[in-house]
């Protein structure tokens, strides 16, 4: 099930912002809607929303995210992809690996797989648009489900978020299991 973060054409009533403001309304709460980070359109999983802009700004500088993804083909062990990414010339959304792009670093570790797909745990050192998708396509293992960069089916989700609560100072760890359709690819 896909839910956009903000209302868009075709999704003017079923966004996360709509749902949260409805929740605020029925509970008589007046708070803001401040996503701490964004997820690409077809990425499932955890999203952290701050109640205040200041909290979002503080959290955005210190939040740690881990992704679970399924790529096509077989990878072994762990590794780092450290190649720059830029907007692909002539496109408004699509990115590509290019020497004159922005630095982009992706750390990955194999967590399972089959003869056709590999389950990965991924941590980003940088946060470029489509970074995971572009990097794995670049090394010849596009994400399952990524029709823009060469994959098939749905293959990425934000599975873990760690942060220090901006008011209490407590360390918070949130986890979310991968979607069933993604896990079916590696079982």
What function would you assign to each model-found segment?
Residues 1-80, 84-90, 181-186:
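RNA pseudouridine synthases
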Residues 36-37, 86, 109-112, 164:
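Conserved positions in beta-strands of structured domains
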Residues 63, 76, 98-106, 155-156:
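Short coil-to-beta-strand transition motifs
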Residues 66, 80, 103-105, 117-119:
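Intrinsic-disorder/low-complexity, polar/charged segments enriched in Ser/Thr/Lys/Arg/Asp/Glu/Gln
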Residues 71, 107-110, 143:
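Conserved hydrophobic positions within beta-strands
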Residues 72, 121-125:
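A structural micro-motif recognizing beta-strand termini
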Residues 112-117, 125, 133-187:
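Pseudouridine synthases involved in rRNA/tRNA modification
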